[in-house]
């Protein structure tokens, strides 16, 4: 499954990543690469937990749009 992720850099210099389609699924890393590796693991664990509890796995219906202002 593919999921849209949002990655931002916090005031301490860490990259924070979250998955809008999976509430509460987020992680961080010292580098973008580390943060993206971590979010893949977090997504797998999140989905595994949903399956274990016989819960529906959300589909990603996000649309990516960049707006320049």
UniProtKB/Swiss-Prot annotation:
Coiled coil: none annotated. It comes from the Archaea. Belongs to the UPF0150 family. This is UPF0150 protein Ta0767. It comes from Thermoplasma acidophilum (strain ATCC 25905 / DSM 1728 / JCM 9062 / NBRC 15155 / AMRC-C165).
């Amino acid at each position: 499954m593919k999921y849209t992720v949002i990655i931002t850099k916090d005031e301490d210099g860490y990259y924070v990543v979250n998955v809008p389609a999976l509430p509460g699924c987020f992680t961080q890393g010292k580098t973008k690469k580390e943060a993206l590796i971590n979010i893949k693991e977090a997504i797998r664990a999140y989905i595994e937990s949903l399956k274990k509890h016989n819960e529906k796995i959300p589909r990603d219906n996000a649309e990516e749009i960049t707006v320049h202002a």
